[in-house]
Amino acid sequence: MTAPADKGKKAKTDADGGAAEENEQIDGALVLSIEKLQEIQDELEKVNEEASDKVLEVEQKYSEIRRPVYLRRSDVIQTIPDFWLTAFLSHPLLSELLTEEDQKMFKYLESVDVDDSKDVKSGYSITLTFSENPYFEDKELTKTYAFADDGTTTINATSIKWKEGMEIANGNAKKKGSKRPLVEESFFTWFTDTEHKSLADGVQDEVAEIIKEDLWPNPLKYFNNEAEELGEDDDEEGSDADEGEEDEEEEN
C-alpha cells in the first residue's frame, strides 16, 4: 500500500510536468508569433525603402526644374541693393551670427546659391558670391556637403584669402562698446568648420540647414519683413513731422 506522502509527491511531479509542457507550448507559440511579426516588419521596411527611392526620384526631377528658376531669381535679386544683407538681418537666427564687421562685408554680397548634387541624396553646396571688396580676394566662398551611405558627412569649404590687414584673427572680432575686450565670433568662421561629422552622433550644421531649408526657398519673405519695418518707421517720422507743422501753424 502506497503511503499518502508518496501519492502527494507523485501528484506534484505530474503537475510540474504538465506546467512545464504547457510553458513550452506557450514559448513555442510566442517564438512563432515574433518570427511572423519580424517577417512583416521586413516587408514593411522593403516597402518604405521603395517609397524613399520614389520620393528621391521626384525630388531629383523637381530640383532640376527649379534650378533655372532660381537662377532667374538671382539675376533679379542682384538689382536690389543690400538684398541679402537685409534678408540675413531680418532672419531671427541668422541675424545673431553677423558681427558689425560681418555686416560691412555683407554689403558686398551679390548672391547666395544652394545647389543640390546631381543625386540629391548625396549632398549639396552653398555658395556666397561677393563683388570686389576691401576684405578678401575671393569672388566666391563655397561650402560643400557630401553624404556617405554610412551616415558620415564630408565637408569642404573655401579657404578665405584675406587681404593684408583684414584677416579676422581666429575668426573672432573684438566687440565694441565694452570696457572688457569681449570677443564675438564672425560668421565667416563657418567656412573653417570642415571636420568630418556623423549624423548618427546627432551632429548637424545648423547654419547650413537654416540657409538651405529656410532662407533659400523664399528670401523675399525676410527681406520684406525688414522693408515693412523701415516703411513703418518712415510713416511714424512723417506723422510726427506733420503734427509738428500743424502745431507751428496753430501758434502763428
From Swiss-Prot:
SUPFAM superfamilies: NAP-like. Residues 1-15 have a biased composition (Basic and acidic residues). Its main location: nucleus. InterPro entries: NAP-like_sf, NAP_family. This is NAP1-related protein 2. One of its GO terms (cellular component) is chromatin. GO terms for biological process: double-strand break repair via homologous recombination; nucleosome assembly. Residues 1-23, 222-252 are annotated as: Disordered. It is found in: Nucleus; Cytoplasm. Acts as a histone H2A/H2B chaperone in nucleosome assembly. Residues 226-252 have a biased composition (Acidic residues). Transmembrane segments: none annotated. Keywords: Chaperone, Coiled coil, Cytoplasm, Nucleus. The acidic domain is probably involved in the interaction with histones. Belongs to the nucleosome assembly protein (NAP) family.
